[in-house]
Amino acid sequence: MSYFPWLTILVVLPIFAGSLIFFLPHKGNKIVRWYTIAICLLEFLLMTYAFCYHFQLEDPLIQLKEDSKWIDVFDFHWRLGIDPLSLGSILLTGFITTLATLAAWPVTRNSQLFYFLMLAMYSGQIGLFSSRDLLLFFIMWELELIPVYLLLSMWGGKRRLYSATKFILYTAGGSIFFLIGVLGMGLYGSNEPGLDLERLINQSYPTTWEILLYFGFLIAYAVKLPIIPLHTWLPYTHGEAHYSTCMLLAGILLKMGAYGLIRVNMELLPHAHYLFSPWLVIIGAVQIIYAASTSLGQRNFKKRIAYSSVSHMGFIIIGIGSITNIGLNGAILQILSHGFIGATLFFLAGTACDRMRLVYLEELGGISIPMPKIFTMFSSFSMASLALPGMSGFVAELVVFFGLITSPKFMLMPKMLITFVMAIGMILTPIYLLSMLRQMFYGYKLFHVPNKNFVDSGPRELFLLICIFLPVIGIGIYPDLVLSLSVDRVEVLLSNYYTK
């Protein structure tokens, strides 16, 4: 057992080191870029070392615990700890954030502030996934809002202020329900407020109160995940944000909602989750069909990919609602799989948009010949997104299918109906993705357009793409790389449902 404060260092290092960016020389961006990359690499290497040498994979309980007095007046503590459920999300955060800083290389305007905001997001994300106190969880949840709002409003597209305002209104509105739930859970049945997750796991509530708490938390997670109809901020945000910001949004920010749904709603409120689970499965199935159908009608290819993300989140919702070992492990696998695939698709869309200065599909065509590397990688990750066998997306969706089919919670006919709806969604996915590829990369439309910078991917971009492609293939061929991390913890979590 390690008593060294590994998690505190991992949470504090990015934002503390990021604040030193403003003391670096103002002339040129090279020093700021390399400094930020070095901080992200150091953070990723530190977390890899800590987890390899101080984390026991076979132990499903909380490890690397830290507990320090924080606000003495209210007896609030700085409580950190990780288990196999949070391990994958933390490693995904380190991996994607490091590559997102590399993707942000072309940013030159106010680069010091830009990279500081990315590092502040990094701290908030690591803090959220390692929090063992509900108040600390909420603070880390809110810490994301300001950096994302500034990244959107200062480095976005023409409608960046509209998309940033929509993002902040939706997420802040959801956070109000989150805060009410935190206060209600902490103050219930006790003269002294206590928000330690270890204590709250053993806390029981009246059925009506538990349902109200569950619904409040669900609204907050439904905004971030997102769950229809609270998803409308996402297409605008992804359509206007810089592609490095999109990588963080699609790769990590959306997964915070899924993680919260498992960590708080499922773990702390099992009775309410058991009652709500059929509705989650229905909403997930409807979301797969709705978002896939809406994606097919989008003229802007960035928004088409954004609706694709909403559709794939439906599989995570179904996996969480299935209340089975297989289904929940499939949801966790889909969280990591879409983190890789979604982030890369937005990176490729952004790099293509930077070169063509066009986003509408009817204006595109014929760019596969001048940009063959972008075409190859875009096609490869589109195949991963549409669940081609041998890639991570296929395994994740297949495991969720099996989880739903084997669920004792549902009768045969509802399971058949939901499975049929999911299958239709999987058919729609290649339709909207392959039609996008055809409109963008085939034909001859752009060959005679003057003043277009048809430059293919350089070494930096290829390195980034290959780094993400390797785990996508690795998980697709050998999914036990991920499943072995979570299977024991999932079994312990679901024991609440079978014993109660």
Swiss-Prot record:
Q: What is its main location?
A: plastid
Which cell locations does it reside in?
Answer: Plastid, Chloroplast thylakoid membrane
A GO cellular component annotation in the UniProt record: chloroplast thylakoid membrane
Its membrane topology: Multi-pass membrane protein
Taxonomically, the superkingdom here is: Eukaryota
GO MF annotation: an example: ubiquinone binding
In Gene Ontology terms, what is a biological process of this protein? electron transport coupled proton transport
The yes or no answer to whether the keyword Membrane is present is yes
- Regions that span the bilayer: 4-24, 35-55, 87-107, 111-131, 134-154, 167-187, 211-231, 242-262, 272-292, 313-333, 334-354, 386-406, 417-437, 462-482
Q: Which family is it part of?
A: Belongs to the complex I subunit 4 family.
Protein known as: NAD(P)H-quinone oxidoreductase chain 4, chloroplastic
- The organism of origin for this protein: Zea mays
Give the encoding gene's name.
ndhD
